[in-house]
Amino acid sequence: MERRASRPSSRRLPALHRQREHNLSNAARPIRHHAVIAALLFLLAATSPAQDWIRTGTGLGVERVRLAASDFKSSTPDPNNVNLLKTFNDTLWNDLDNAGIFDLVSKSFYPLQEPGQPSEVNFPAWNSPPPNTSMLAFGNLGAAAGRVTLQGWLYDVKNEKSPQVLGKQYADNATPDAVRVIAHKFADEIIFRLGGGVAGIAETKIYFVSERSGHKEIWMMDYDGANQQQVTHLGSISLSPRISPDGSRLAFSSINKGGWEIMMYSFDLNRMVSFPRFGGMNLSPSWSPDGKIAFSSSRSGYPNIFVVDASGGNPRRLTNDQGPDVAPTWNRKTGSQIAFVSGRTGLPQIYTMEADGTNLQRVTDQGYAVSPNWSPNGQFLTFSWERKYGPGEPGSNDLYLMDVASKQWVQLTHDAGRNDFPCWSPDGRHIVFQSHRSGSDQIWSMLADGTNVKQLTVKGANTQPNWSWK
């Protein structure tokens, strides 16, 4: 366990550690570790259909589909096929494994003869031990004249009379990048069919801050950490990247001669575009589902929460406190609520309010709580919480998941360095976050129950991830 000095780091809200905490009468209540699954399943059964648990819980309490993903076969003699097949097979397997909803059958259990066409499927060999699978993904890939063609099927091998669940054909350039995209598309089709109609995330992007170029710039990568590339080249300090719901614009905070301002990058134009300057310190933009932007601004003195339209016009002040109030995040399902961090009672705590600034509610009741992010179904917040913050306390920044209505919470990370800036995937099954567990700040992902933790970045310091909406 890491021990933190009582003095907050520079990323924390100024002067908040010198004030005293206040207790809540409606305190956030822990769900004890041994009762996590039972308590949350009961809660979800009482408040939402089972589909919501699939979206949020990554299979807790739900039987996983047993799935075999056979290596696709070559359908042409082109020598380029070998490398392209490996790229496809590796990518498809990783996508299905990352989904968190399958019991993937080990390839060591597969029959010697794996199918490349429907006529080659040996049903008894697949639906009995050792594979004993319910579903089988298989197909073939061929490359010729610089083009690649792929045929893929998903079969219910327990239903020999009518086995086909999915059949797809794809064609693209015969390059590794194009084949990766095809694998992502096929994986997402399988996930959609077998995952309760929830769209897969294999084609989504993650935006983050990286120092590897010598400056804090905004970068992007595929959901699995592949294809990392720099977006901004401002040669300054850029923070808090937030992608718009349609994926066309990226809002972030950056410091220039005028101070901290909200900046905007257009992916349609592949360049920075103008955005109004508001004066004061302007930080942590957040998009609403309908394209408004909430952010923290000190234009009126103390940092408070403001909201503007997509072009930066029609600014409205939502909070009016000596806070400071920072880090807003919209309810991504309804757009009618905003969660944010405030130091109005001492140490920073998480609050919610209506999108017009009314109905203020305190969510956390102790410690040091920051970086809230709302789940796609609007039911949960995930955030970083040092529950025992203070001199002499063995505090640790861990990630928590809280049901907003009941204030019941579950701890997702356990004393694995500093963990911060969690962000939900669009399917609600995954969370990406920043962690210092490897000895430097890097981007990690996990299932929304805290399992299947994977490191996505390695080079340089990488922080503040934001997952695309789709």
Annotate the PLM regions.
Residues 201-202, 245-246, 288-290, 332-334, ...:
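Residue-level detector of Asp-centered blade-edge/turn motifs that repeat once per structural unit
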Residues 206, 250, 293-294, 338, ...:
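Hydrophobic beta-strand positions that form the internal "hydrophobic ladder"
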Residues 58-124, 140-141:
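Short beta-strand->alpha-helix linker/helix-N-cap micro-motif
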Residues 52-53, 117-189:
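Amphipathic beta-strand/beta-sheet edge segments enriched in Tyr/Trp
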Residues 210-217, 233-236, 253-262, 276-281, ...:
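A flexible loop/linker signature enriched in serine peptidases of the S9 family
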